[in-house]
């Protein structure tokens, strides 16, 4: 998998911030972030939405992460069609501009 620098979005106590991580493309919608390429990364294995920078799911290991993603795939597809998703994309783009 091709590695890239990706800015993930954290919302802590209602405050947005971005953190650069090394990510790999998992599929057309999602980046995979692992602790092996991000030593100080707070979450174990994670998948992030490419357009919003938001976390989709996590796992204790890569297999659990894949299993968890398979469980939420249908719901995630519905979210991508929602008005809220478009709002999250705009917010993410604004955060990147402000940095």
PLM features: what roles do these ranges have?
Residues 82-85:
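Membrane-proximal basic amphipathic "stem/tether" segments
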């Amino acid at each position: 998998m091709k590695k890239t620098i990706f800015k993930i979005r954290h919302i802590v106590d209602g405050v947005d911030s971005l953190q650069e991580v090394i990510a790999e493309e998992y599929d057309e919608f999602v980046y995979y972030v692992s602790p092996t390429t991000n030593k100080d990364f707070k979450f174990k294995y994670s998948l992030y939405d490419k357009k919003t920078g938001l976390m989709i799911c996590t796992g204790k290991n890569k297999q659990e992460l894949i299993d968890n993603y398979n469980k939420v795939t249908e719901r995630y597809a519905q979210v991508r069609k929602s008005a809220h998703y478009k709002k999250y994309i705009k917010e993410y783009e604004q955060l990147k501009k402000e940095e």
